[in-house]
Amino acid sequence: MPRPVVRALTGVLALTAAAAVLPLTSPLPAAADSIVVGGQPAPVADSPWAVALSSRDRFGGARAGQFCGGVAVAPTKILTVAHCLGEEALGGPVSRVRDLRVIAGRDRLSDTTGQEIPVRGVWVNPAYDPATNAGDLAVLTLSRALPQSSVIPMARAGDAAYRAGTAADVYGWGDTTGSGTYAPVLRSARVQVLPDSECARAYPGGREGTYDASGMLCAGDPAGGRDACQGDSGGPLVARGRLIGLVSWGSGCGRVGSPGVYTRVSAAVQWAEGRI
């Protein structure tokens, strides 16, 4: 079965990700993830927990080396997705990326505001399955702490924020059109959490991917046009002030009937028990 398209970009992948079913990362020498389609600028002062993953060595300096997103859930802990740290995205093992950093407190990637904090520890969910994107989770440990005010609470199992119909916002620096136009500043798009039954109909298996409600949730705009996209992978989906999802995969960007699929944070908390 062809692998669902993640929202991270890589060399050749960066040219075709908008039309394929792949994980969401960003363009340039290696591979990276997607951006927010149909959104608007989102001042980082209002969303200080939204961070960018960076490696200038692997992705060049034009966008500060940004290739994926992440979210601060503790002063030294960043949640992102496993496919952002895979060899396909990075062009080699993550252990060989000597300049892996988290960019925090920066709206425009070309600016020098905020902080670029080296990553001192990487944990990738050992149960992650690249063929299905199940278990798409990684935890980064920072070499120095962010302020507590830059941390977002995580929605646990049973939280009302997961209810179908709930308004949510997805954040990223990824593709804003689905055709390779990357955002220079952090953006967000308003979507809604969709029923698991609708997600399962959209992704029943086969070429379009398989939706698994135990570790995934999906969200989108029923009319299409608003979604995460390439370069947004690992970025936050936030509802009622709490983190409910991480950008993971989808079919295209903003298509009617093809909602974005996210790692379910209540499941991530269990997978990463003791590491957050």
Per-region residue spans from a language model:
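Chymotrypsin/trypsin-fold serine protease catalytic domain
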Residues: 117-118, 133-137, 143-222, 265-267
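Solvent-exposed loop/turn segments at secondary-structure junctions
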Residues: 78, 84-86, 108-109, 129-131, ...
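Protease-domain processing segments flanking chymotrypsin-fold serine proteases, especially trypsin-like
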Residues: 2-79, 87-95, 101, 215
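Conserved H-D interstitial segment of serine endopeptidase catalytic domains
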Residues: 53-56, 81, 86-127, 204
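Short glycine/serine/proline-enriched coil/turn segments at secondary-structure junctions
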Residues: 60-62, 110-111, 129-132, 161-162, ...
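C-terminal subregion of chymotrypsin/trypsin-like serine protease catalytic domains
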Residues: 5, 51, 72-86, 98-101, ...
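Conserved, non-catalytic sequence blocks in retroelement Pol enzymes and Pol-derived host proteins
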Residues: 39-44, 128-130, 208-210
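Active-site region of chymotrypsin-like
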Residues: 47-66, 145-153, 187, 195-233, ...
